[in-house]
Amino acid sequence: MATNYSANQYEKAFSSKYLQNWSPTKPTKESISSHEGYTQIIANDRGHLLPSVPRSKANPWGSFMGTWQMPLKIPPARVTLTSRTTAGAASLTKWIQKNPDLLKASNGLCPEILGKPHDPDSQKKLRKKSITKTVQQARSPTIIPSSPAANLNSPDELQSSHPSAGHTPGPQRPAKS
């Protein structure tokens, strides 16, 4: 639960009576409690680092890249290679890794590359193999027995009341015995 600090003149407006809260509020603190630990001084009064503080060999302002140093087109944060060809995926990853300064900058990118590209030539070969297999399997003739719906001329049989039978259901006639 959040802590509430005293705001003096504004305190009355936020009391539970005026806010019409149904639950009592958490009691407020008059002063902030002290934290554990201590602050380590690393600079003198002029803002210069003390001699005991280790200095970075890199740029003292960090690796921030300003707007004018960024490329015109910024790659996306998440790239999926699943629906791409191998050549397209290779050119996309090459474009992402083309600017190493942008990848190393503190405000730079860490694009997430997901999936594996597919090769359309291998897909065509797989389709041809599956087509030839289905043709070889379909050589044996399949005999379909005559369905009862084929003899619609005989009045002795009941008509189907199912709507998918191709006609609207009519009154049922009992079978003649």
Curated annotation (Swiss-Prot):
Main subcellular localisation: cytoplasm
Biased composition (Basic and acidic residues): 115-124
The keyword Signal belongs to this UniProt entry's keyword annotation: no
Pfam families registered for this protein in UniProt: CFAP126
Tissue: Expressed in airway epithelial cells.
Top-rank lineage group of the source organism: Eukaryota
One of the record's GO cellular component terms: ciliary basal body
BP GO terms, sorted: cilium organization; flagellated sperm motility
Biased composition (Polar residues): 132-163
Subcellular location: Cytoplasm, Cytoskeleton, Cilium basal body; Cell projection, Cilium; Apical cell membrane; Cytoplasm, Cytoskeleton, Cilium axoneme
Keyword Cell membrane on entry: yes
Oligomeric form and interacting partners: Microtubule inner protein component of sperm flagellar doublet microtubules. Interacts with DLG3.
Function recorded in the entry: Microtubule inner protein (MIP) part of the dynein-decorated doublet microtubules (DMTs) in cilia axoneme. Acts as a regulator of cilium basal body docking and positioning in mono- and multiciliated cells. Regulates basal body docking and cilia formation in multiciliated lung cells. Regulates kinocilium positioning and stereocilia bundle morphogenesis in the inner ear.
Protein family: Belongs to the Flattop family.
Designated name of the protein: Protein Flattop
Organism (species): Homo sapiens (Human)
Recorded name of the encoding gene: CFAP126
